[in-house]
């Protein structure tokens, strides 16, 4: 195995490597905090990530993804929230998550208003709700003391588009498992070096034996699935199933979630 590619194994995708990326991000974000202090926490998949790189800022997902932290909460702390918000808040309040701690600001997609309100109520850092590209650029440059670079934006956009295209190719033209594809899509974002992330996907594209014809793929929808994907995968019986993130009418959701869902899961 090299750089997350199992060249001689049954599957090329090393899921342990992908899961470990989040732990690696702890170290990378801490090192960044101690040097340039240019990490921004993000929540939501609809943010124009290329603009962060254009402003010299590294975007990293911030939601808590496990229940381990719950035991460190004070009585009734974060009660009444879904597991996603509860995990994130307890990590934030106890300062036990290096990613959350290292962020100079948090940028959130305007979707879950409960997440937005909870974060604002528990941090003195800037919590910015994304509205448009121009305002995001101005906010990033002002807070981080950087300048917008159009060349950096174009390069980052090219890398992100390439990765998105490879993911689409893997989704419809390979027989990777539901869990493998989910981790590729959602956990590769913890690879904070965008150049290394692109090279990883280049190696995947070179080594995966793609099918000639598009496969018939089923989709299972989930709310904020980084934390409950194992529970969702346990109920998936077809390898040609992909977990997608939605905000309304999801197949799987959490207790206390503000959005509608069909079946409850948890951390």
PLM features: residue spans?
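Extended, charge-rich low-complexity interaction segments
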Residues: 89-107, 150-166, 266-267
């Amino acid at each position: 195995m090299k750089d997350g590619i199992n060249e001689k194994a049954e599957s090329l995708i090393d899921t342990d490597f992908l899961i470990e990326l989040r732990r690696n991000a702890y170290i990378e974000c801490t090192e960044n905090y101690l040097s340039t202090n240019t990490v921004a926490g993000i929540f939501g998949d609809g943010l124009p990530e290329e603009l962060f790189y254009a402003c010299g800022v590294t975007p990293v997902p911030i939601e808590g993804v496990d229940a381990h932290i719950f035991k460190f909460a004070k009585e009734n702390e974060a009660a009444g929230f879904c597991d996603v918000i509860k995990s994130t808040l307890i990590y934030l309040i106890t300062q036990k998550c290096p990613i959350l701690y290292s962020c100079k600001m948090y940028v959130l997609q305007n979707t879950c208003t409960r997440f937005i309100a909870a974060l604002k109520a528990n941090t003195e850092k800037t919590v910015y709700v994304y509205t448009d590209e121009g305002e995001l650029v101005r906010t990033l440059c002002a807070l981080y003391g950087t300048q917008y670079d159009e060349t950096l934006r174009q390069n980052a956009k090219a890398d992100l588009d390439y990765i998105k295209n490879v993911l689409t190719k893997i989704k419809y033209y390979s027989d990777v498992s539901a869990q493998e594809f989910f981790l590729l899509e959602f956990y590769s974002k913890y690879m904070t070096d965008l150049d290394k992330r692109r090279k990883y996907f280049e190696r995947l594209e070179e080594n995966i034996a793609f099918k000639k014809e598009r496969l018939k793929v089923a989709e299972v929808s989930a709310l904020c699935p980084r934390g409950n994907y194992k529970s969702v995968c346990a109920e998936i019986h077809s390898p040609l199933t992909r977990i997608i993130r939605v905000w309304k009418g999801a197949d799987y959701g959490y207790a206390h979630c503000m959005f509608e869902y069909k079946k409850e899961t948890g951390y």
